[in-house]
Curated annotation (Swiss-Prot):
Record Pfam families: HnRNPA1_LC (PF11627), RRM_1 (PF00076)
Modified residues (N6,N6-dimethyllysine): 92
PTM remark: Sumoylated in exosomes, promoting miRNAs-binding.
Phosphoserine PTM positions: 17, 73, 137, 177, 189, 200, 213, 219, 224, 247, 312, 329, 332
Protein name: Heterogeneous nuclear ribonucleoproteins A2/B1
Organism listed in the record: Saguinus oedipus (Cotton-top tamarin)
InterPro entries: HnRNPA1/A2_C, hnRNPA2B1_RRM1, Nucleotide-bd_a/b_plait_sf, RBD_domain_sf, RRM_dom
GO biological process: miRNA transport; mRNA export from nucleus; mRNA splicing, via spliceosome; primary miRNA processing
Amino acid sequence: MEREKEQFRKLFIGGLSFQTTEESLRNYYEQWGKLTDCVVMRDPASKRSRGFGFVTFSSMAEVDAAMAARPHSIDGRVVEPKRAVAREESGKPGAHVTVKKLFVGGIKEDTEEHHLRDYFAEYGKIDTIEIITDRQSGKKRGFGFVTFDDHDPVDKIVLQKYHTINGHNAEVRKALSRQEMQEVQSSRSGRGGNFGFGDSRGGGGNFGPGPGSNFRGGSDGYGSGRGFGDGYNGYGGGPGGGNFGGSPGYGGGRGGYGGGGPGYGNQGGGYGGGYDNYGGGNYGSGNYNDFGNYNQQPSNYGPMKSGNFGGSRNMGGPYGGGNYGPGGSGGSGGYGGRSRY
């Protein structure tokens, strides 16, 4: 039987103890299935652990079983597992942010709430479903939101961009509240704010004492300032500070999530604002615009404007340069500084 694509079978494991080895990581995760790969990312010079790694299972069902059994504790430390994001996706808005709310585009007039509930219930426990309608006409605007009780269903759903719901092709994205979008924007500058693990000035520890105490840190930091693991089979970050916390913060100086500007439901904002033509009235280049523009809605939620999310400039070899998981590229900031799981 042909295996599912690797991107559906791989987990990023953050917050590892520096004492955790590949053997102890493997031993822990093998309780949920057979691993085809397991790695603790290390500094190439000192060979010291960078505090994160990846495990790849033989099936997505095993990943689901592992994620259903959270929290995970390895070598006396609670770790943070997340479904890994492939390199080609990691530069897109929303790739690494952790949210419980899902944006669903391409909703047709004959699609009702129960269609969304029936489809998405298999992924996890649904809290709320909202299909956005026009205030005057009552017609559906072509999009809606599904909120789960956990971030993992959203992470799993967006691994596959298109879903067929009620016979129609729908596109899914992570949704951010306006406040979350503003936090991400403020963190782009690499200063101030309190988005996630702390001050982006960094300099000292990882998860612990030391100036900054963020994912970036100095030589002991969550990535040692060299980039998110220098890549891992196309799933990492390139060298140069764009790691789990390059000082520019969430997405770096080149845009960050949304690249600034108004958000979804703000005047002139719109979903994407140039990213795949969202917000310009053409959801997916005109495919989903039956009900007009997606922008200027009263909703406070939605993925934001364009810009990059961590960058995607570095390519490189198997262990040298992709953009996998919470990781940026070449100093553009990557996942860290103030990221949140």
